[in-house]
Design a protein with these regions (language model features):
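Aromatic-Pro/Gly-enriched surface loop or interdomain linker
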Residues: 1-24
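Residues that flank catalytic or metal-binding motifs in active/ligand-binding sites
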Residues: 2, 24, 60, 75, ...
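C-terminal substrate/ligand-recognition segments
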Residues: 4-6, 31, 211
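Short loop/turn segments at secondary-structure transitions that flank enzyme active sites
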Residues: 5, 12, 34, 61-64, ...
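Conserved beta-strand scaffold positions in the cores of enzyme catalytic domains, especially
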Residues: 6-8, 55, 188
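Generic recognition of flexible, low-complexity loop/linker segments
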Residues: 15-19, 43-46, 174-178, 211
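Short alpha-beta junction capping motif
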Residues: 22-70
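Long, C-terminal catalytic modules of enzymes
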Residues: 65-66, 70-211
């Protein structure tokens, strides 16, 4: 509707062409659910960002699982659901290492690269497909470093509509966490609120630590 020209980059292209591909662009926007990445993919995105590229993460539960690609066949992906994490199945002991590259699988967080280090936020909780809105932080409009982002946005809440769950914040929720790598100078523009208590929201397992 706005007439912006864009190119689509697949995960396969990101893995194999890496920074050579990303460096052609001033801005790279992730898809809605960029959950599975190889080390080469993360390296490319991180270097692109550090070299001045504009990396815009507009998804949820991103950069979560470490994967490996088959060296002998395009499109074949391996994932080991090791240790913790929200997962469809649990890998058995002895099955935590990838066959394709012999590296330890599981969460990128367990491999020393939590998503907060790359994009400032990471998944915190999961619930039903009940999506809600975001409320813009009042102090953001008075901050000249970031208030340009809200040029033309006159409302105080955004994200009321969506194809899944009828709102932008639902099912899997991300949050900032300086312990895991969110920069000290990060600015939170908006936060979701009013998630209904009847939706069974739970912390992801890796957040539930005890003695």
């Amino acid at each position: 509707a706005k007439g912006f020209a864009f190119d689509l980059i697949t995960d396969h292209e990101l893995h194999h062409e890496a920074l050579d591909l990303l460096s052609r662009y001033k801005c790279v926007v992730t898809g809605t659910h960029p959950e599975y990445h190889t080390a080469a993919m993360l390296d490319a995105l991180e270097t692109y960002r550090d070299q001045g590229g504009n990396l815009v993460y507009l998804g949820g539960n991103g950069f979560y699982w470490k994967i490996a690609l088959a060296p002998y066949r395009d499109g074949l992906v391996e994932i080991r659901r090791a240790e913790g994490g929200i997962r469809a199945w649990a890998a058995e002991p002895g099955e935590y290492y990838n066959q394709f590259d012999a590296e330890y699988g599981g969460l990128w967080r367990r491999n020393g690269r939590p998503p907060q280090q790359l994009v400032g936020v990471g998944v915190r909780a999961q619930g039903d497909f009940v999506g809600l809105y975001y409320r813009i932080k009042p102090e953001v409009r008075a901050n000249p470093d970031v208030n340009w982002i809200l040029d033309g946005v006159e409302v105080e809440t955004i994200g009321h509509e969506g194809f899944s769950g009828h709102g932008a914040a639902g099912f899997e929720l991300d949050r900032a966490d300086k312990r895991l790598g969110t920069p000290e100078n990060a600015v939170i523009l908006a936060s979701s609120e009013d998630h209904p208590p009847e939706a069974p929201w739970v912390l992801v397992p890796e957040e539930q630590l005890t003695h």
